[in-house]
Amino acid sequence: MSATLQKLAELTGSSLIGDSTLTICSVANLNHATPRDLVFCEDEKYLGDAFASPAAAIVVGEFAASAHDAPKPLLISTQPRLAFAKAAKVLRSHKKRSGGIVHPTAVVPPTVVFGAEVVVGAYVVLGEHVHIGDRVCIGAGVCIGSDVKIGTDCEIHSRVTIYHGTHIGNHVIIHAGAVLGSDGFGYVRDKLTGRYHQMPQIGHLIVGDHVDIGANVTIDRGGLEDTVIGAGTKLDNLVHIGHNVRIGENVVIAAQTGISGSCTIGAGSIIGGQVGMGDHATLEEGTILGGQSGILSEKIFREKGPCFGTPAKPLKQYLREQAALSRLSRRSE
């Protein structure tokens, strides 16, 4: 999809210097830009390179607000990276569908309710009483259990499995291979026989609006309560979230992180890759955990600022301890 610079300025909340009628077809980096592309320059020291590139126009910060004689049109934003992301989303969007399509190989019971312009791919299997909102796109081989509710404008990519009773909000993206709402890891040990017995998982999974779920993510349904993923949260590939976990709004979790059952993660938290959280742990709002950090079971973590290590601690303390260990090891040589 293409758009004029004037349209992109309006959609991104940017001010415009230069030809407002210029049509932009795509986005690119400086090294691969063409005369039809929009590029991004967040640092003033690279502005000369951006001007020298073949790009049609540049998204820049306020440092270029007075560059009225610039050789290329400029979109000027207080948050240029965000403006570029919004422009990229507009330019990569596809033309809206004029109608829904259900592939003839899909299994669709008569109790399924479709909104407008829903697309259902090949070999999709839908359970009884599934409700699917307007403009939802379901990829090939998706399996959706009974009583699932999906909001509007969602993208569900191929081979996703959504277990019964799961509720998914609006504008949610679920990438290939994700499994949502499976049974949690809940077992009770018989002390006499040593045998483990499953605790029935009767809760549900609730996913808020504007959540992105990466490939091969697994999220368990609740045991007695619901598992909740807050609006605006982004989950990278291969993240696991256990039963009864409650994640606040706008949380970011990187790949290979494991969240044990009944954890609570406050809104706005940032969690790096390969982080591990023990069961019933709590992260307060705005927590920042670096990669491979560990949170002990039942810990209430209140530290502010970047934290690293196992158990996790403030970055300055972590670095001091690492330096001390290094000095000790050299003394013993």
Swiss-Prot record:
Catalyzes the N-acylation of UDP-3-O-acylglucosamine using 3-hydroxyacyl-ACP as the acyl donor. Is involved in the biosynthesis of lipid A, a phosphorylated glycolipid that anchors the lipopolysaccharide to the outer membrane of the cell. The keyword Transferase applies. Pfam families: Hexapep, LpxD. GO terms for cellular component: membrane. PANTHER family: UDP-3-O-ACYLGLUCOSAMINE N-ACYLTRANSFERASE, UDP-3-O-ACYLGLUCOSAMINE N-ACYLTRANSFERASE 1, MITOCHONDRIAL-RELATED. This is UDP-3-O-acylglucosamine N-acyltransferase 2. Transmembrane segments: none annotated. One of its GO terms (biological process) is lipid A biosynthetic process. GO terms for molecular function: N-acyltransferase activity.
